[in-house]
Amino acid sequence: MKLTCVMIVAVLFLTAWTLVMADDSNNGLANLFSKLRDEMEDPEGSKLEKKDCQEKWDYCPVPFLGSRYCCDGFICPSFFCA
């Protein structure tokens, strides 16, 4: 009986997880790959090349020592630029 309940809960959890994580737009992966290809063809359009620092509330890998990752005027007190 316990095993049956555990299996039912596991199936429900995995079903819910799949529905939550599913991309609801049509042809989502194709759109993603076409955007990435366009950025590779046009390096000026790439956001990564334009931005060398992290903006406010962006992740910084090393707190207290990671202020060099944040843009000017921001510090990294707890894994996020503030």
From Swiss-Prot:
SUPFAM superfamilies: omega toxin-like. The keyword Signal applies. GO terms for molecular function: calcium channel regulator activity; ion channel inhibitor activity; toxin activity. Residues 1-19 form the signal peptide. Pfam families: Conotoxin. It is found in: Secreted. Expressed by the venom duct. Keywords: Amidation, Calcium channel impairing toxin, Disulfide bond, Ion channel impairing toxin, Knottin, Secreted, Signal, Toxin, Voltage-gated calcium channel impairing toxin. Residues 20-51 form a propeptide. Its main location: secreted. The modification Alanine amide is found at A82. The keyword Signal applies. Disulfide bonds join C53-C71, C60-C76, C70-C81. InterPro entries: Conotoxin (IPR004214), Conotoxin_omega-typ_CS (IPR012321). GO terms for cellular component: extracellular region. The presence of a 'disulfide through disulfide knot' structurally defines this protein as a knottin. The cysteine framework is VI/VII (C-C-CC-C-C). Omega-conotoxins act at presynaptic membranes, they bind and block voltage-gated calcium channels (Cav). Belongs to the O1 superfamily. This is Conotoxin Tx6.6. It comes from Conus textile (Cloth-of-gold cone).
